[in-house]
Amino acid sequence: MNSDILYLENADYSDFLVDLSFLKIERPVGVTGLLRVKNDAEFIELCISSCIDALDELIVTYQKSDDNAPEVIEKMRKKYPHKIKVYFYEPSILSHNLSKEELDFVKTMPENSVHLLSNYYNYSLSKVSYKYVVKIDTDQVYFSEKLKGICDLYRSSYTQKITFKERLVSNIALYLDHCYNVLPLMGSLFFSNVIMGYYESYIKKMIVNKKVMLSVSGVNLFFDKNGWEIPLGNNANGIRSPFNGVGDTLFFEISKDTYYTPWECYDKRRNRYFYLEKFYKKEQTVLQGGFLWFHLDAIRKNKYLDNKSLYNGNTIKVADFLKKKNIVNVNRILFMKSFRFYYNVSSTNLE
């Protein structure tokens, strides 16, 4: 059993209990980033620097750390005092790498327990000052211009006419997106070149007009003697796939129907359990926004030396990955399962 939870069982954590009535508060137009931190000092400054200009506000909540993450957070808060707000989340959380006994224990806790990861996420959400929100992760470096462009769409107050062709092509794109298991050999070049220009225009206008939710993803990076490369694994073999966070990051408007609930999952490979968070959003339209960041997990200091040998021969140069003639050489099944997030990667500066 996790001793941290038992040891702090009788502590006064009333300040960390979350009343979901905060979801009904009217907020001014703007975009808030939510950054939750535990360790990760090596990436915090780079992450914040890449996203802060695009955001109206960055809420940083952090837990007890084993490195100097709190000091780095304070450094960045002082650098951007008009945008960054920092909160320390004191309760310990039981969520990752759980035994069956620990999982059974944590599932007995009430859904709003301060020791659940979902409550930690809701606590962070409760500190938001603006109407629109996006999750920010410490080990991600954002495509700053694209992020600002998306935030500007949510901040926009005017409407734009959606053309018949844009609407038609968007329906075709969504249909093809649902067919990737049926048509695994469908050419991504057609999808990217012919359809995606109209689809991207449609997405932008839908955000401006309807403030729909937008789902975004990232690109995993690795670094070796040849420079920056993209891994070609499948995660199950210990090597990252080319894509990161496929669909797990949303831009959304805070409402009574947007909050976090507990979510249980099991890692068969390691025989460990996880009691994480799941974003509840009722039934709302979600459009795909393509790539928005580089994911740096594979080059963490505590992983890099082991990964150098593991990743050897299982990467592709960033420039080659973006060349149309080489895209077809990427694992087709892996690629097609994620190709709906690929369409506008070439518009970002990945090299």
Question: Where are the regions that the model predicts?
Answer:
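Short beta-strand-to-loop acidic/aromatic patch adjacent to the donor-nucleotide binding site
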Residues: 130-143
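Active-site-proximal specificity loops/subdomain of glycosyltransferases
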Residues: 10-28, 68-132
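N-proximal low-complexity "stem/linker" segments adjacent to membrane-targeting elements
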Residues: 1-50
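A short acidic, amphipathic alpha-helical/loop segment
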Residues: 46-50, 72, 149-150
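Catalytic-site signature of metal-activated, phosphate-bearing donor transferases
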Residues: 1-18, 104-122, 141-351
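Short, acidic, metal-binding catalytic loop of nucleotide-sugar glycosyltransferases
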Residues: 49-61, 65, 75-76
